[in-house]
């Protein structure tokens, strides 16, 4: 594999292991990236197995050519939030044995200054997962209202100085538009101070803008609901999160579908009916990376893996 596509997949063995790969199973890698998890799945699949990979990043689609000669593999260019639609088009609803989701931005995207995801590298303020469509971060910052910016920074970045930063951006953009990542990062560093050790003051704002531009949390909601609807009985769901917003969504989703429908006290419903409304069971506890993995790959530090299994009622 070329250096361009080199990428250390986080919690690789644990995530793929959580899928309980069957020789002839059908699996979905909803976030192909550079193919680390897909490669591991293909290595464990038999000749009659099948892997459907999904990604909206054109560079990821290019990277998928490494598996072009493998008849068990196919790549879909699109967002993982629409995975249920893709599965329906393929006539595989209820036949999927496992879904893997590695959420957030990938290392190659962060490391490529031209993608505009990182405040550590100067590049165009883009931040689109699919840079062939949609508005860029620069375009949004140029016309967003102060209240809207503050809401995004607070909601998606949990930024305590959200309103102050939004006001400063609005004041400065009238003089010079924010077109480069360095422009935005320098402004935030100048007007705020991060109280979190070893964390750049712009970290939360960059995260918030990226999540908003790409509708990431909506994509997660849609993907999780879609996964439950396409999984076969005993099919597995493995999801890696990288920050509290993502993990909260995944944790609550698994809990909600593990407990079944909530009914008012005294409502005439049988235990069997409640059981039939349960769609998932959590498999073990949340898995964190080992100290050894964090030492090899610092970006694994904040990762959390949760695994669930589709129930058969």
Curated annotation (Swiss-Prot):
Domain of life the protein comes from: Bacteria
Record key words, sorted: Cytoplasm, Methyltransferase, rRNA processing, S-adenosyl-L-methionine, Transferase
Broad class of the protein's primary localization: cytoplasm
Residues reported in the UniProt entry to bind S-adenosyl-L-methionine: 35-37, 55, 80, 102, 109
Subcellular location: Cytoplasm
InterPro entries referenced in this protein's UniProt entry, alphabetically: RsmH, SAM-dep_MeTrfase_MraW_recog, SAM-dependent_MTases_sf
Catalytic activity: cytidine(1402) in 16S rRNA + S-adenosyl-L-methionine = N(4)-methylcytidine(1402) in 16S rRNA + S-adenosyl-L-homocysteine + H(+)
Cellular component annotations (GO), alphabetically ordered: cytoplasm
GO molecular function: rRNA (cytosine-N4-)-methyltransferase activity
Enzyme Commission number(s) of this protein: 2.1.1.199
Enzymatic class: transferase
Pfam families for this protein: Methyltransf_5
GO biological process terms, semicolon-separated: rRNA base methylation
UniProt xrefs under SUPFAM superfamilies: Putative methyltransferase TM0872, insert domain (SSF81799), S-adenosyl-L-methionine-dependent methyltransferases (SSF53335)
Protein's job: Specifically methylates the N4 position of cytidine in position 1402 (C1402) of 16S rRNA.
Similarity comment text for this entry: Belongs to the methyltransferase superfamily. RsmH family.
Protein name stated in the entry: Ribosomal RNA small subunit methyltransferase H
């Amino acid at each position: 594999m070329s250096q361009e596509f080199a990428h250390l997949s986080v919690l690789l063995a644990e995530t793929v292991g959580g899928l309980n790969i069957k020789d002839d199973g059908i699996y979905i890698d909803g976030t192909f990236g550079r193919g680390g998890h897909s490669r591991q799945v293909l290595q464990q699949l038999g000749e009659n197995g099948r892997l459907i990979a999904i990604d909206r990043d054109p560079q990821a689609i290019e990277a998928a050519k490494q598996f072009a000669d493998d008849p068990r593999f196919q790549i879909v260019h699109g967002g993982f939030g629409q995975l249920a639609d893709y599965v329906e088009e393929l006539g595989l609803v209820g036949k999927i044995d496992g879904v893997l989701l590695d959420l957030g931005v990938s290392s190659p995207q962060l490391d490529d200054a031209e993608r505009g995801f990182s405040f550590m590298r100067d590049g165009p303020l883009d931040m689109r997962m699919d840079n062939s469509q949609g508005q860029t971060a620069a375009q949004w910052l140029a016309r967003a209202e102060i209240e809207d910016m503050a809401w995004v920074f607070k909601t998606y970045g949990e930024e305590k100085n959200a309103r102050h930063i939004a006001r400063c951006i609005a004041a400065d953009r009238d003089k010079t538009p924010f077109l480069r990542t360095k422009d935005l990062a320098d402004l935030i560093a100048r007007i705020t101070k991060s109280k979190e050790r070893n964390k750049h003051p712009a970290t939360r704002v960059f995260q918030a803008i990226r999540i908003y531009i790409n509708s990431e949390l909506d994509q997660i909601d849609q993907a999780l609901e879609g996964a439950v609807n396409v999984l076969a009985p005993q099919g597995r769901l493995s999801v890696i999160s990288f920050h509290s917003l993502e993990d909260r969504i995944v944790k609550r989703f698994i809990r909600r579908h593990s407990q079944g429908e909530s009914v008012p006290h005294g409502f005439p419903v049988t235990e069997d009916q409640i059981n039939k409304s349960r769609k998932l069971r959590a498999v073990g506890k949340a898995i964190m990376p080992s100290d050894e993995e964090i030492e090899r790959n610092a970006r694994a530090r904040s990762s959390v893996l949760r695994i669930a299994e589709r129930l058969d009622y």
